[in-house]
């Protein structure tokens, strides 16, 4: 399997990430996918998402939403969390991730990407040189093209679980 498809970490939920520890390690920018990463597909920001972004801002993180959706969808979510966003990002192309870092004032050494899809989120962030955290999708209801991709992702995750320590070593802490 290709290492660029493997995340640096694979966790149950965005909400189980230890963001306090990541800040202590020197990370300052977090780029998020929205649908099935922060809320179910198409949903507005809920209390849990709003609380998360409030906490991240209090810690000192610069946050960005990076989505392939059109602006009305991204803006609907962002109206409650008030962070920077890029819509129609063209993931997995690395240009959107690089633009996000430029807006945030961060670089590959102190930026993290959190998303729920391997072929768009993880692949693009890896190509841009950003630490990746893959999370399990929040809700099983998805569009048909994503359902088909999930079957291929299951194969990648099988190889990841079997070989990730050999293929891709644990990511080093960010420089301060």
Q: Across the structure, where does each feature detected by a protein language model lie?
A:
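Asp-based, Mg2+/Mn2+-dependent phosphohydrolase catalytic module
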Residues: 2-32, 42-43, 47-61, 66-176
């Amino acid at each position: 399997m290709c290492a660029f498809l493997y995340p640096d970490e694979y966790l149950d939920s965005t909400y189980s990430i230890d963001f306090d520890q990541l800040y202590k390690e020197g990370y300052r920018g977090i780029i998020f996918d929205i649908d099935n990463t922060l809320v179910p597909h198409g949903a507005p920001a809920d209390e849990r998402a709003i609380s998360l972004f409030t906490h991240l801002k209090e810690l000192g993180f610069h946050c960005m939403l990076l989505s392939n959706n059109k602006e009305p969808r991204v803006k609907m979510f962002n109206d409650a969390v008030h962070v920077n966003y890029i819509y129609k990002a063209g993931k997995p192309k690395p240009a959107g991730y690089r633009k996000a870092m430029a807006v945030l004032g961060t670089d590959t050494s102190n930026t993290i990407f959190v998303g729920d899809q391997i072929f768009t989120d993880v692949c693009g962030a890896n190509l841009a040189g950003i630490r990746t955290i893959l999370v399990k999708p929040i809700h099983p209801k998805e569009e048909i093209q994503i359902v088909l991709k999930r079957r291929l992702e299951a194969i990648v995750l099988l190889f990841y679980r079997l070989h990730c320590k050999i293929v891709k070593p644990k990511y080093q802490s960010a420089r301060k």
